[in-house]
Amino acid sequence: MLGNMNVFMAVLGIILFSGFLAAYFSHKWDD
């Protein structure tokens, strides 16, 4: 169970980080 939770947290973090990067760069390119 703990292993699955670790993987879930890692995937969630990557998705959130990717979304943050996408938003950051899209705002940057709007200029």
Swiss-Prot record:
Task: State its location(s).
Answer: Cell inner membrane
Q: What keywords appear on the UniProt entry? A: Cell inner membrane, Cell membrane, Membrane, Stress response, Transmembrane, Transmembrane helix
Q: Does the keyword Membrane apply?
A: yes
Q: What happens when the gene is disrupted?
A: Upon Mg(2+) depletion, deletion mutants have lower intracellular Mg(2+) levels than wild-type cells.
Q: Which NCBIfam families match?
A: small_MgtS (NF033842)
Q: How does it assemble?
A: Interacts with MgtA.
Q: Which Pfam families match?
A: MgtS-like
Q: What is its main location?
A: membrane
Q: Where, by residue number, does the polypeptide cross the bilayer? A: 5-25
State which ranges are Periplasmic (membrane side). 1-4
Q: What is this protein called?
A: Small protein MgtS
- InterPro entries tied to this protein: MgtS
Bilayer topology reads: Single-pass membrane protein
Task performed by this protein: Modulates intracellular Mg(2+) levels to maintain cellular integrity upon Mg(2+) limitation. Acts by binding and stabilizing the Mg(2+) transporter MgtA, thereby leading to increased intracellular level of Mg(2+). May inhibit FtsH proteolysis of MgtA.
What does its record list under induction? Induced by very low Mg(2+) via the PhoQ/PhoP two-component regulatory system. Induced by SDS/EDTA (envelope stress), at 45 degrees Celsius, repressed in minimal glucose or glycerol medium and by the thiol oxidant diamide (at protein level). Expressed in both exponential and stationary phase in rich medium; expression is higher in exponential phase (at protein level).
The record's Gene Ontology cellular component field reads:
plasma membrane
Question: Where, in residue ranges, is this chain on the Cytoplasmic side?
Answer: 26-31
Which GO biological process entries does UniProt record here? cellular response to magnesium starvation; magnesium ion homeostasis
